[in-house]
Amino acid sequence: MRSVHLLIKPASGMCNMRCQYCFYADETSKRETPNYGIMSRQTISAVLEHALEAADAECTIAFQGGEPTLAGLDFFRFAVAEAKEKNRNYARLHFAIQTNGLAIDDDWAAFFAENHFLVGVSLDGTKEVHDCNRIDAARKGTFGRVVHAIEIMERHGVDYNILTVITKNTVRSYRAIHSFFKKKGFRYQQFIPCLDPLEEERGGKNWSLTPELFEKYLKQSFDLWYEEAMAGDKQYHRYFDNLLCM
C-alpha cells in the first residue's frame, strides 16, 4: 500500500502581505525567476494524475505559498474535483492549506468545510505582537482581519490550527500569547522559528530569533504547557507533542 504526500504552491511566491520576516520573500528575491505566476489548470491536473496513479492507500494534498488563496477559489474547486475524479485507486484523500487568512470569507469557509480541509492560519499572537511584523501591502496590521477569518471558519465548522512564527517579541510576550490563545479556544498550535535573511548577519533584525532566545522560549513555554497538561488542560503544541512521541 502506497501513500503520497504533495505540497503544491499554486501561486508561486505571490503574497498579499508584506511580513517583515518573510523567508520566502527573501528567498524568491534571489532566484533567477522570482515568481512563476498562478499554476495552470493543465499543470495541476497533470500533477494530480501522476500522484493518484501512485497512491492506493492515502494521498495528502497540501497547498502553500506565498499565499495559495491568490490562485482563486475556482482554482481550488477545480483541483479538488480533479483529485476526486482521478482517484481511481480509491485512496483516502486529505486536503490541507496554509494561509494568512486575508481572503477567507463565507464562500471559502464553506468550501473548506465541505471538502474537509485542514486549514493552518497564520496568527502571531496578540494584536501587539502580530501587527509588529504581519502587515499588508499598505503596511497596515492584519490582526483584526485574521481573527475575523478564524471566526468565519469556526461558524462553518472548519478544522484549523494556528501557525505562529517565533520572533524576539514572541519570547518577550509568550505568557500573553498563551493566555490569548487559550481565551480564544485555539487548542491546536504550531510554532515556527523565525529565520534571518540568508545573506545577512544573524541576529541583526529587530525581530531576529537568536539561538539563546529560542532556548529561552522553549524552556519557558514548555514549563507552562507541561504545568497545564498535568492539570488536565492540555493544548496541542506540535513541537512539544512531537518530542514526547519520539
List PLM regions with ranges.
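Radical SAM enzyme [4Fe-4S]-AdoMet core and its adjacent flexible, acidic
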Residues: 137-144, 151, 155-246
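Short, small-residue-rich loop/turn micro-motifs
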Residues: 12, 21-26, 123-127, 193-195
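Short catalytic/ligand-binding loop motif for oxyanion handling, primarily in non-cytosolic enzymes
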Residues: 28-31, 70-72, 128-129, 171-172, ...
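Amphipathic alpha-helical segments in well-structured domains
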Residues: 40-44, 76, 143-146, 214, ...
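Short acidic, glycine/proline-rich loop/turn micro-motifs
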Residues: 31-34, 131-135, 200-205
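Conserved alpha-helical substructure of the radical SAM core
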Residues: 1-99, 103-110, 114-115
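Conserved AdoMet/S-adenosylmethionine-binding subsite of the radical SAM
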Residues: 70-189
